[in-house]
Design a protein with these regions (language model features):
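Short amphipathic alpha-helix that is part of the acyltransferase structural core
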Residues: 1-15
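Short glycine-aromatic motifs
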Residues: 1-3, 20, 94, 99-103
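Short, hydrophobic beta-strand segments that form beta-sheet elements in well-ordered domains
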Residues: 2-5, 22, 82-86
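Conserved donor-binding loop and adjoining core beta-sheet/short helix segment
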Residues: 17-63, 104-106
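Acyl-donor binding region in acyl/amide transferases
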Residues: 46-97
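Conserved catalytic-core motifs of GNAT/GCN5-like acyltransferases
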Residues: 100-114
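Short, charged/polar, Gly/Pro-enriched secondary-structure boundary elements
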Residues: 117-119
């Protein structure tokens, strides 16, 4: 398994948790199929959130890397780890950054951030 961030490759989920910047693609069932690796089955959705946001150009209906890097940087500056935030907090920060469309999963985690123009 090779998880990707701009500075290094991560070999474990623990490293992924530490760096949180991952480049992955998603199949039609929402499973993580990455160009650099696959997250283990059963990885909580909360830990996969950035993977689902930070997808490749193969999935143009979801926001691309450059916007996700902005999002990651913003959360980092605010002292948050993205997957630890509540849905209302996520909504607030998405709104601040111009993420106007998103869907929620039944378990309460925001799953998809759709590609759209920032207002």
């Amino acid at each position: 398994m090779r998880l990707y961030n701009p500075n290094k490759y991560c070999e474990t989920v623990e490293e992924f948790d530490k760096y949180m910047i991952v480049k992955e693609t998603i199949d039609g069932n929402g499973h993580m199929i990455g160009r650099f690796g696959v997250l283990p089955v059963g990885t909580p959705w909360s830990k996969q959130l950035l993977c689902q946001i930070m997808v490749s150009e193969d999935y143009p209906h979801v926001r691309l890397i450059k916007d996700c890097l902005r999002l990651c940087e913003h959360f980092d500056k605010m002292g948050y780890r993205l997957y630890a935030m509540s849905v209302p907090e996520l909504r607030r920060f998405f709104d601040v950054l111009g993420f106007k469309e998103y869907g929620e999963m039944d378990d309460g985690y925001i799953r998809w951030i759709y590609n759209g123009k920032t207002q």
